[in-house]
Amino acid sequence: MAATVYRPATAPIADAPCEGLVCLELEDGSAYQGYSFGAPKSIAGELVFQTGMVGYPESVTDPSYRGQILVITFPLVGNYGVPSRETVDDLLKDLPAHFESNQIHIAGLVTASYAGEDFSHFLATSSLGTWLKEQGIPAMYGVDTRALTKRIREKGSMLGRMLLQKEDLAVSAPSLGVPGDWKPHFETIEWVNPNEKNLVAEVSIKEPKLYKPDEATALKHPSGRNLRILCLDVGMKYNQLRCFIKRGVEVLVCPWDYDFSKEEYDGLFISNGPGDPKVMDTTVEHISAALQKNNTPIFGICLGHQLLARAAGAKTVKLKFGNRGHNIPCTSMVTGKCHITSQNHGYAVDATTLPTGWQELFINANDGSNEGIMHVDRPHFSVQFHPESTPGPRDTEFLFDVFIQTVAKCTTDNTLLQKGVEFPGGTTEENERLHPRVDVKKVLVLGSGGLSIGQAGEFDYSGSQAIKALKEEGIYTVLINPNIATIQTSKGLADKVYFLPVNAEFVRKVIKYEQPDAIYCTFGGQTALSVGIQLKDEFEALGVKVLGTPIDTIITTEDRELFARSMESIGEKCAKSASASSVEEALNAVKDIGYPVIVRAAYALGGLGSGFANNEAELVDLCNKALAASPQVLVERSMKGWKEIEYEVVRDAQDNCITVCNMENFDPLGIHTGDSIVVAPSQTLSDEDYNMLRTTAVNVIRHLGVVGECNIQYALNPFSREYCIIEVNARLSRSSALASKATGYPLAFIAAKLGLGIPLKEIKNTVTKVTCACFEPSLDYVVVKMPRWDLKKFTRVSTQLGSSMKSVGEVMSIGRTFEEAIQKAIRAIDFHNLGFSESKGALMSVDDELQTPSDQRLFAIANAMHAGYTVDRIWELTKIDKWFLSKLKGLSNFAKDMTKLTANDVVGRPDLLLRAKQLGFCDRQLANFWDSNELAIRRMRLEAGITPFVKQIDTVAAEFPAFTNYLYLTYNASEHDVSFEDRGVMVLGSGVYRIGSSVEFDWCSVRAIRTLRESGFKTIMVNYNPETVSTDYDEADKLYFENINLETVLDVYQMEDATGVLGAMGGQTPNNIALPLLRAGVRVLGTSPEMIDTAENRYKFSRMLDRIGVDQPTWKELTSFDEAKAFCQKVSYPVLVRPSYVLSGAAMNTVYSEADLESYLQQAADVSPEHPVVITKYIENAKEIEMDAVAKDGKVVGHFISEHVENAGVHSGDATLILPPQDLEQTTIQRIEEATRKIGAALNVTGPFNIQFIAKDNDIKVIECNVRASRSFPFVSKVMGVDLIEMATKAIMGLPFVEYPAIDRPSGGVGVKVPQFSFSRLSGADPVLGVEMASTGEVASFGVDKYEAYLKALMSTGFKVPKKNILLSIGSYKDKKEMLPSVAKLSQMGYKLFATAGTADFLQEHDIPVQFLEVLAKEDDQKSEYSLTQHLANNMIDLYINLPSNNRYRRPANYISKGYQTRRMAVDYQIPLVTNVKNAKILVEAIARYRDMEIGERDYQTSHTPLQLSGQVNFTLQDSLSRPHSFKKAHVLSVEQYTRADLHLLFTVAEEMRLSVQRGNVMDILKGRMLATLFYEPSTRTSASFEAAMKRLGGEVISIATQHSSVQKGETLQDTLRTLACYADAIVLRHPDETCVDVAKKYSPVPVVNAGNGSREHPTQAFLDLFTVREELGTVQGLTFTFVGDLRYGRPVHSLVYLLRHYSGVKVQLVSPKGLELPTDVRQQLVKAGQLLCESETLTPEILGKTDVLYCTRVQKERFPSEAEYEKVKGSYRIDNQTLKHAKSKMAIMHPLPRNEEIAEEVDFDQRAAYFRQMRYGLYCRMALLALVMSG
C-alpha cells in the first residue's frame, strides 16, 4: 500500500514570495508537504514535538534539541518575531541576552502556520524566517502538526527528513502540493539518527571559562574568595548560567570530558544537554569520582540528572516520545506539592535501579516516571525538568537557591556533607495535616439570579458544574436561585432548589430552615459574593463554613484601596490613582502619578465627566468640568493603548497553583473586557512576557489566599515590560466560563472540589482520563470570543464602548488560524454578517469610529482597510496590536482580489477555493464575491473535494489520547480526529444570547439532549455560545463548537451521516434555517419546515386562521405611506407597526397618530428590507395569554396556559406571567384550548409550539404562533412539574410517552415569572415597557397566591420593599382612577406619599394625604424640600411609581421629558421603579398582604387543573367538498371560468391534501371512481401527476395512448370522448387544436379537464403555478412577475396572466425574442388590469432586480414553421448564477418543465429555484381539483 501524502494544510502567506515546497518524509513512509520559510536545504534528523505555546527563540537555541527536527504543536509561530542577536546579557557580558546559546541547535523546524514578516513585538528586529536563514536552518509551515503529533505519539519518536523541492520543477498550484508520486519533485538525502553521534561533544564549550558575579552581590567563601560552582557543560542553556550569576556565585564552565578533579570549587553542577546518556562514559567516570570523594554538594539538570544517576549506578531508559512542553506536573516526594515544570528530553532514569542510599525526589504526576533523585545522607540531588525554564514556568527556580544555600553552609560546616539536602515547604505529612479534607454533608450553593448585563448564562454553566462536582463527592446540595430558566434549577441536579431571592434576608432564612454545614458564594457572580460579604459575621453563629476562597480575601479584591495596599505589600503595582476635591489637589496628585492621566468624576454614573489629560492645561480644564458635576474627582494613570491580558489561575488548599488559560484582548485597555474581542491563548506575548505575568499571577493568588479559581487582569505596556494589575476577581467569572470552553478544562467543577480541601493532584483530568488536573492546558488552536450588543433595542443609549459593559451575549469560535477563528466569530454574532468584509451599513466617519470605538468597530476597520488605510494608520487610531491588524488586512486584500473574479473563473482553480476556505471565508461570502449563490459554491467545493476536517479539543495538544468528543471544524488540517459511526441525532442550540433569546433555549436544548440520551440515541450538539450548559463537553455524545448556519449544519450532517436534525429547541436561530435544510435534503425532525414557514409567514398564517375559523386582529401589508394612512384611518388608531420574521419584536412600535406613523415607518423599513412592513390594529386594554403546548401529528398531547399581568402591548418577553392563571374565565380558557387544537392540527405540529392570544370580553384573538420551544417552556415545565420538552422530544422521535400526564406539584400554589432588566447598565435607556423587548433575563418564585409569589419574584430582581416614602406620578386620568384604591391602601398602611402636580391634586381631592413635589431645574435648589430631583438624588424615596401617559407602551420621542428624566434618575440611584399600572396594583396588594414572608413547603394551593383536550378539529375536507362550488361535476376548460373565491377554495383544499400526504394518511375520497387520460401530444409531468393524484385519492386511471388507439383509424375527437365517458367519471384531455375545448363542452357527458389546448391555455398548470407562488412567497398580492422566453406559444403563461387579474398590486414584466411576444388579446388583458410594467427583448439587471417571480418557458421547436426560425431564437435566454446575482435574495424561479438550455443546472442548487417543488405543489393542486370535480 502506498504511504499517505498530505498536501499543505494551510494557505500560503499572502503577498510573500513563494520559497518552494518542502516535503517532510517520516520513517513510516508518510509524507507531509508544506512551504519553506527557512534556509533552502534538505536535512534529516529525529522528529520530536513540543507542546509549549510560547518561547520558540529559546527552544530552537536549546542545545538539548541538537540534531532534532522540532515540531511545534501550537499552530501560530513567529508572531512576535526574533529579538536582536547583538544585544548582550547584562550578567553574562559577552553572551547574547535573549537566547539559550549562541546558535540554533535544531536540525529543522515544522509548524502549522507562520506569521511571515507580520511579526509584532517591541524587541523584535527580524522575522523568525530571516534568522533561520542566517543560521542555515531549514523550516516549513503548512503541516497539520496535530496529525503529526498523534503519529509520533502512537509510534514513538522517529526519524524524519525535510526534502526541498527541486528548483527546476515548478508546481502549478503550490497550495495543492504534489499529489501521488512526489519523490521526483524533491531532493533526496540519507536518513540520519542523531542519537548515534556524540551530540554533547558538538555543543559543549571547548575550553574552561570563568564567569564572575557583580561584586556587590557576590557570595563569599570563609577564605574571602568568591563561592565557586564548577559547571560541567554537557549542553548547557545560558539561563542556568544566569540563574547562578544573579545569585552571586562565580561559575567555572568546563567541557564535557574535562577532568575537573584537580580544580578548586565549592559545588558541582551538571547541565542539561542532548542525546543518549549511555554514550557519555568519560563524563560518568568523572562524576563517579566526585561522588566517591564527596567534597562538595552536587546538582544536576536534565541530561545532568541522568548522568548523575548513571554515575551512582542506576540505569536510564529511552522514553517513547519524550516529554517536551511547559506544562508537565511533577510531585515532590518531600513536600507532596505538585509543580508545573518545563521539560525537554527523550530519556529518563529508571527508578527501580537506584542503588541504596538514593531515593526519588520528584515523580511525574501523569505517568509516575522519575523526575528527580536525591541522596539520603549526602548533599547530592538532580532533576529531570528545567528549573531555569526559558521557555516555561519559573515555579521551580527555587532549586538553585536550595543548591547555593547548601553549598554555602557546607563551606562553613563540613559535617553537612554527611547529610541530605534540606528542601523548603515542610513534609507531605505536615502539609496534609495542616490542610485536611473539609468534612461536610450538606452544602448551600448560591446562584446568580436573573440574567443581566455583566452577569449572564456563564453562572448557570459554572453553578451546574459545581453542583455536579459536589454530587460526585456524595454531598447533599441545596441551591438558591430564582432563575427558573436555568439548567441548574432543574430536577436531577441539586437535591433541593429554592426559587427565592439571593439576598441576605432569604439566605439567612434558608440557612435556618435547612441547616447546611457549608456554603459556596463563588458560583453566583457578584450577587452571591455580595450576600457572602453581608453575612460574613453571621456564618459562624449559624454553624456554616464558607468553602473555597475566604470572604476576607473577597473583600480585599473588591475594595480598590485595600487591594492596592495588599499588592504593594508584595511589591506588585496597581494602576496609580488618587482622589482630589479641588483642582489644586488634582495637580499635586499628578506629580506622583505622571501624565497622561484619566480623570473621572466620583459617584457619577456611566462615566459622566471623565476624560484623558496629557498636560496641565487639559487637566485643569477637565477637573473644572468634573468638579461641577461631582464633589470629588479620581485621577488615575492613563494606560490607554496598553494591552489588556488576563489569566485564569487555580490554587488548592495545599498551595499548588496553576494557570489554566491566558487571554489577550484584541482591543487595548479602555474597553471593558466583557465588551472586548478576546483571543486565547495570547498571540503577541513572548515567553518572557507570558511567564513574567504568569509568575505574578501565582504570587498574587498565593498572597491573597484564594482557594479555587480566580481571574487576574493586567495592563501591559506594548513598548516595555511595564505592567500593572487592573483587578482580581476571586470568583468564577465570565472569563472563567470562556477559559473552560476555550481549553476544555472544567474550571468550576475543579474549583468546587478544591473548596472541599481536595488537592489538585488527586483530581483526574476528565478529558484524558490518564493525566491529573494539576496541569496547564496546551492549546493547538486559537479561540476568539466576541461580544454581541443589542443597543438598537434602546433609544438614547450611546453605542460607544468604554469601561462599563453593555453586551448582552457572546460567541466563541475555534480555528487553527486567527483568520479562521475571527471570521467564524463575526458570523456567529449575527446571521447578516458574512465575515470580515466591508459593510455598507450607516457608520459614522471611519476615523471617529476607529478612535472612539462603538459596537460597529470591527466593521469600521474592514471599511477602512477597504478604503486603503494602512495597518500603521489604523494602529495609530486604534492601538490594536499590529499583528491582529496585519491578519485582518490579509483578509481584506484577499476579499478585494476575489471580487474581481466570477464563479466561472474559479471553477478550474480549486487552489483558490481551498485558500479562501483556509482563510475562514464562508460559502455565502464567496458567493457574494463571485456573483453566485451559496449552494452553487457548496457544490463546486464538494466537487473539488474541499470539505472541513473535524478536530478535537483535548487540553493536551494531542500529547495524550482524549476521551471527549469536544470538536470543531477547520480547513487548516489534513485529517479528521474522530470517526463517524454514531449516526446521532443533531440538536441545534440557541446560539448567541441576546435580548429575546437567552438561557431558556439552552434549557430546552439540554433537556432535549438528555431525553435523547436516556432513550438510547446518540446525540450531536451544535452550538457556539461559551456561556451555556449545552456546550459542556459531557452533555452530548459529540459537541461541535460551531456556528448554526446552513453551511456548517450541512457539513456536520453529511460527515456524521446524522439520523436527523432537531431544531425546535434552540429558538429562532435554528428555525430560520429549517426550510433551507429541508430543501438541501436534510431530515428535519418534528414539525415540517414548510409548516413552520406557514406559521411565520403572515399571509399563509392569516389564511390558515381564516380557514379554520380562528380570529386575529385586523392587519394589512404595506408598501406605501398613503396605503398605510388609509388603512389606519379605517381601523382607527392605535396600531402596531412591525416587520415580518423578527425575534422579540425588533423595531415594532405602537403608533397613536399619523405623525408617529411616518417616523416609525422609516424605522421599521430599515430592520429587514427584504420583508415588508405590516400594520395591525392594536387592541387596547386586552389581556394577553400565553399557551405552551406539545402536539404529535397535529394532535395536542399536553398544554399549559399562563396569563400576563400587564395588558397586551407589553412584549411577552417583558411581561409578568402567572401560572396557573388566576383571573381567566372558564369560557375564555375553553376557547383558547379549542383554538390551540385547531392550529395544532392545521399546522400538523409534532413537537413544541407556543401561541400568544389576546382576550377582551371573552373574545380571543391570536397574535402569533411559534412552532418551536418558546421562552416560557422552562417556567411552565417547572411550575407544573411536567417537562414539556421531554414530552416534545419523545413525540418527535416517535417514542412512547403519556399524554396529559398527572401534574406533579403541591395542590394550590402559584408560580409567577418576572422579567429582569439591565437598565442601570445602559446609561440613558428609558425604563418603560413596550412592544420592543428590553429585559435580559427572568426570575420566578412560588407563593400561596399570586401576590406572595409576585413579591418574592420581584425581590429576586433586586427590588427592595419600600420602608417609608413612596413617590407617585400618574399620567392618564384612566390610570389615576384605576390606581386610586391601591394608593388609598398605601396610605392606610402608613406610607408617606409624595406626588407630582396632577397626581397630587387628584389624590387630595379624594382625601388622601400627600406631599407635592415638583420637578425643578438645577438652579432652583433653594426649594429643595419640594424638589423631586433632590429627593431622588438623596435617596429619600423608597419606591417610585411612574405611570407615563403619552408614551403608552412606546419608546419615547426624541425630546427629553421630565418624566423620562425622573425615571432615569430612579434607575441611576437604584430606587425601585414601577412604570406599569397592572404591576403597580399587584405590587401594592402584595405589600399589603405580605410584609414578612416565611419560607416552607407550599401545602395548600389553587383549585383547577388544565382541561383535557378532546374532540376533532371541525374543519375537514368533507366539509369543503360537500358545500356547493363552481368545480362540482363541471368541466375545467378555461381559467376565465373562475373567480378569486374559487381559487381560494381550490388552494385551501390543496393545503389539506398536502397535510394528508405528509402525514402519510391513506385517502379514499375517490374510491370506486375512474379517471381517463387522453393525450394527443407528448406529456410526462401532466399525465403522471393526474395519475398519481387520482391514485392517492383512492381512484383508478385508464390512460389512452392515442398513437395506438382508434384515432389512428380516423375516429373523431367527439366520438372518442363519448366512448370514454361510458367507462370513466371524468376525462383529462390534451389536444393540439385550440378548439378542442368547444368540442368537449358540446359532446362530453362527464367533466373534461383541459390539460392544454394547442398553444392557447393550460388551466391546471396555471393553478399549480399560483399555488406554488403562494407557498413559496406567502402571497401573490403586490408581487412582480417576469415572464421570459416563448410567450407566444407558452400556454401556461396565457392562463397564468388571466388569473393574475384577481390579485391587487401585481406587476408583470415581459421578456421575449422578436416574433415570440405575448398574443395581443392576452397582452390587452394586462393593460386593462394596469399590470403591465415593461416589455423587453433582453433580461436586464434592472428587470431582474424588481422580480419576485421569474417564470421561464421553453422555446418549443414544435411550434415553429421551419427549423431555421427555431434555431435563430432557441438560445435567447439562459438563467445561471451569474445572471441571478442581480436578483432579490427572496424570490422564486419557476418553469413548467421540461427545460432545455433556459436554466443552467447550477441554479438547481439555489434555494430560490422552485421548479422541482412546483411539481410537488402540482400534485396537491391536481388532487384538490379532482376531489372537487369528482367527489360527492
UniProtKB/Swiss-Prot annotation:
Activity versus pH, per record: Optimum pH is 7.5.
| Location of region: GATase (Glutamine amidotransferase) | 2-400
Q: Which residues form the ATP-grasp domain?
A: 564-756, 1102-1293
Task: Look up the record and report any one GO term of the cellular component aspect.
Answer: cytoplasm
Which positions bind Mn(2+) 1?
A: 713, 727
**Where is the region ATCase (Aspartate transcarbamylase)?**
1529-1832
Instruction: Give binding positions for L-aspartate.
Output: 1609, 1691, 1754
Pfam families found in the cross-reference section:
CPSase_L_D2, CPSase_L_D3, CPSase_sm_chain, GATase, MGS, OTCace, OTCace_N
This protein's pathway reads: Pyrimidine metabolism; UMP biosynthesis via de novo pathway; (S)-dihydroorotate from bicarbonate: step 1/3; Pyrimidine metabolism; UMP biosynthesis via de novo pathway; (S)-dihydroorotate from bicarbonate: step 2/3
Amino acids binding Mg(2+) 2: 727, 729
Which reaction(s) are listed as its catalytic activity? Answer: hydrogencarbonate + L-glutamine + 2 ATP + H2O = carbamoyl phosphate + L-glutamate + 2 ADP + phosphate + 2 H(+); L-glutamine + H2O = L-glutamate + NH4(+); hydrogencarbonate + NH4(+) + 2 ATP = carbamoyl phosphate + 2 ADP + phosphate + 2 H(+); carbamoyl phosphate + L-aspartate = N-carbamoyl-L-aspartate + phosphate + H(+)
**Sorted alphabetically, which CDD domains does this protein's record hold?**
GATase1_CPSase (cd01744), MGS_CPS_I_III (cd01423)
What's noted about domains in the record? The DHOase domain is defective. The third step of the de novo pyrimidine pathway, dihydroorotase (DHOase) is encoded by the pyr-6 gene which is both physically and genetically independent of the pyr-3 gene.
Report the sequence similarity comment from the record. Answer: In the N-terminal section; belongs to the CarA family. In the central section; belongs to the CarB family.
Query: What is the protein's given name?
Result: Multifunctional protein pyr-3
Q: Which organism is it from?
A: Neurospora crassa (strain ATCC 24698 / 74-OR23-1A / CBS 708.71 / DSM 1257 / FGSC 987)
Q: Which gene encodes it?
A: pyr-3
